Amino acid sequence: MFKAAINAELLKDAIASLAVIVDEVRFKIKPEGISVKAVDPANVAMGIFELGSSAFEEYSADECEIGIDLNKITDLLGIADRNDTVRMELDEGSNKLLIDVGGLSYTLSLLDPSTIRAEPRVPQLELPAKVVLNGADLRRAVKAAEKISDHMLMGVSGDTFYMEAKGDTDQVRLEMGRDQLIDLKAGEACSLFSLDYLTDIVKPTNKVNEVTLSLGRDFPILIDFEIANGAGRISYLLAPRIESD
């Protein structure tokens, strides 16, 4: 059993955060909320999504798992106004999700979860540096880097966090000292990341006041932020681009 009501803009943002990684996901539904763990086909980026029951206007659920085509539900939610309420109910007999939004009623066919890639194991990483900054600053640096290169260097040197992109002839660099950051745990960190992935991953952070980046040297980066006034969380783990000498 699953029955819930949620703000349309919040649901759109949640779905968009997953759609940058994969097209199909397994939603794990429990009485305390919904969670998803997914990895992209190239095994470069992982998304971890949690939305507690308190993020919903109404929420009632037994433990179950459903498969959702993110492109379909994204198109469906496209007609919703930001302040609309989306009402959802699982019809277990037909394996469909009944959705009401903006006076319109939809029946969304669900996927068999067993046909979708299983949840990945989340690696336990010791990442020595941690940076907390405003999401808009992160988005701005990535947008600037896109114009120069297809990859971006991110690291910590002393009390300074930096993001840098170098092209054949041009270069862009953003440095933020401890006083410009919300928080900084200094540590040895310098890794190169693909902007093909970073560009999409940081899009949801533009509305976020605090984004936490955990970094190491030639290690994956963990990008973590809260949504729904702390009732939900989105995390991305992005593998570094290793260049041969």
Swiss-Prot record:
GO terms for molecular function: DNA binding; DNA polymerase processivity factor activity. InterPro entries: DNA_clamp_sf (IPR046938), Pr_cel_nuc_antig (IPR000730), Pr_cel_nuc_antig_C (IPR022649), Pr_cel_nuc_antig_CS (IPR022659), Pr_cel_nuc_antig_N (IPR022648). It comes from the Archaea. SUPFAM superfamilies: DNA clamp (SSF55979). Gene3D superfamilies: 3.70.10.10. Keywords: DNA replication, DNA-binding. One of its GO terms (biological process) is leading strand elongation. The keyword DNA-binding applies. Belongs to the PCNA family. HAMAP family: DNApol_clamp_arch. Sliding clamp subunit that acts as a moving platform for DNA processing. Responsible for tethering the catalytic subunit of DNA polymerase and other proteins to DNA during high-speed replication. Homotrimer. The subunits circularize to form a toroid; DNA passes through its center. Replication factor C (RFC) is required to load the toroid on the DNA. This is DNA polymerase sliding clamp. The lineage of its organism: Archaea, Methanobacteriati, Methanobacteriota, Stenosarchaea group, Methanomicrobia. The gene is pcn.
